[in-house]
């Protein structure tokens, strides 16, 4: 018997930190039995960008709102104004994170942040990696033993510091 697709749902402990539309979108997503991958295909965006829309961390276009409204059967008027406004990023969860998976990502930056910085500086010079001119993907790889591995790709434009 094949395993049933499990869906990401909204963690009730962070609802108060998210835009009002987040709960409606997650409820509709669950009701329709849709994954972020399926929604991303409908919107023509990446899975991570679509999940970011649901959490209020990514600004939606008018086309995103139209397509989400149609796919999820959510009234456009109920989501358009907030989703097309300016996101209030970085407030979805506590700092440091307490959710174990999110904490592992935080821990990666704690443990390897200076190493990443040193290697980037050697390759690109003095500057930073943009999180604005940026994209990311999450992929799954299975090794020869059958173990599943997460592959997270972070791609940001290099922004050199300017002399002034």
Swiss-Prot record:
Q: How does activity depend on temperature?
A: Thermostable for 1 hour up to 60 degrees Celsius.
According to the UniProt entry, what is the EC number of this protein?
4.2.1.104
Upregulation:
Induced by cyanate and down-regulated by arginine.
Recorded hits in CDD domains, A to Z, give: Cyanase_C
Alphabetized InterPro entries for the sequence: Cyanase, Cyanate_lyase_C, Cyanate_lyase_C_sf, Lambda_DNA-bd_dom_sf
Q: How does activity depend on pH?
A: Optimum pH is 7.6.
- What EC class is this? lyase
Ranges that cross the membrane: none
Indicate the residues that form the catalytic site.
Answer: 104, 107, 130
> Per its record, what are the GO molecular function terms?
cyanate hydratase activity; DNA binding
On whether DNA-binding is a keyword of this UniProt record, the answer is no
Q: Which GO terms describe its biological process?
A: cyanate metabolic process
Record keyword Cell inner membrane present: no
Q: Which branch of life, at top level? A: Eukaryota
Known catalytic reactions: cyanate + hydrogencarbonate + 3 H(+) = NH4(+) + 2 CO2
**Keyword terms, alphabetized:** Lyase
PANTHER family named in the record: CYANATE HYDRATASE (PTHR34186:SF2)
Q: What does this protein do?
A: Catalyzes the reaction of cyanate with bicarbonate to produce ammonia and carbon dioxide.
Question: So what family is this one in?
Answer: Belongs to the cyanase family.
- Designated name of the protein: Cyanate hydratase
To which species is this protein native?
Sordaria macrospora (strain ATCC MYA-333 / DSM 997 / K(L3346) / K-hell)
């Amino acid at each position: 018997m094949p395993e049933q697709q499990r869906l990401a749902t909204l963690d009730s402990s962070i609802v108060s930190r998210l835009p009002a539309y987040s709960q409606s979108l997650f409820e509709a997503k669950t009701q329709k039995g849709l994954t972020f991958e399926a929604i991303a295909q409908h919107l023509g965006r990446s899975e991570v960008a679509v999940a970011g829309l649901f959490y209020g961390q990514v600004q939606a276009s008018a086309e995103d709102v139209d397509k989400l409204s149609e796919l999820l059967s959510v009234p456009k008027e109920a989501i358009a104004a907030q989703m097309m406004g300016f996101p209030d990023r970085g407030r979805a969860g506590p700092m440091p994170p307490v959710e174990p998976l999110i904490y592992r990502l935080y821990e990666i930056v704690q443990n390897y942040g200076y190493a990443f910085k040193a290697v980037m500086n050697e390759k690109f010079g003095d500057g930073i990696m943009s999180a604005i001119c940026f994209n990311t993907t999450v992929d799954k790889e299975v090794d020869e033993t059958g173990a599943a591995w997460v592959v997270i790709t972070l791609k940001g434009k290099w922004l050199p510091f300017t002399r002034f």
